[in-house]
Design a protein with these regions (language model features):
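Non-catalytic, usually N-terminal nucleic-acid engagement modules in DNA/RNA processing proteins
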Residues: 1-168
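Glycine/Thr-rich beta-alpha phosphate-binding loop at enzyme active sites
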Residues: 141, 160, 171-186
């Protein structure tokens, strides 16, 4: 099941293990369903339990007792939605996002580079580049800005992944991206 090349040619149902667990199922039960891949979330795992703790535990797979594929979403959507909620305070600019978690009051910074570092500490098989996720009813000009920022961030993620970790050839991990653009197909 660790043949990540299959992901390039096949579709997978990936249950949401946002915080390192699929709700209402044990890892054993999840395996019994035939599930081959799960999706976790960089932002939520950054906040709790934290990438350093996950790394000390041997990565998300050991922490969960999971031997399938793990895709880790970059956290772009969560940053967008949580910063614009009343509980979270923060900002997004060309460098990335800065925000304060109401959970424990800590301030975090998520940049394209730190997103890759966190996903590597988590031990993800498929890393997702940080994206500038915005509301879907944007004016076309704002959507274009979001697409341009997402592309810039994706390039920064890729450059960091290759420079610091040796890229896919050295790590065996895949790097992918999220397509933005609101409701504008072009």
């Amino acid at each position: 099941m660790n043949d990540l090349n299959r992901l390039k040619n096949e579709y997978f149902f990936m249950p949401d293990a946002t915080r390192g667990a699929v709700r209402y199922l044990t890892t054993k039960q999840l395996k019994e369903t035939g599930t081959e891949a799960i999706v976790t979330n960089t932002l939520h795992l950054l906040i709790h339990p934290g990438p350093d703790i996950i790394q000390k535990l041997g990565g998300i797979k050991k922490m969960m007792g999971w031997d399938g594929i793990v895709l880790t979403d970059s956290g772009g959507f969560q940053v967008f939605s949580l910063i614009h909620s009343k509980k979270w305070k923060g900002s997004i600019d060309e460098d990335g996002a800065k925000f304060k978690s109401p959970r424990e009051g800590n301030t975090y910074e998520l940049t394209p580079e730190s997103s890759i570092d966190i996903q590597m500490k988590i031990g993800s098989d498929v890393l997702v580049t940080l994206d500038d996720c915005r509301k879907s009813d944007l004016e076309k000009e704002e959507a274009q800005e979001s697409v341009e920022r997402t592309i810039k961030w994706a390039k920064r993620c890729k450059d960091h992944f290759e420079k610091e970790y040796g890229g896919t050839k050295k790590t065996g991990k895949l790097l992918t991206c999220v397509v933005q653009g609101a409701n504008y197909p072009e």
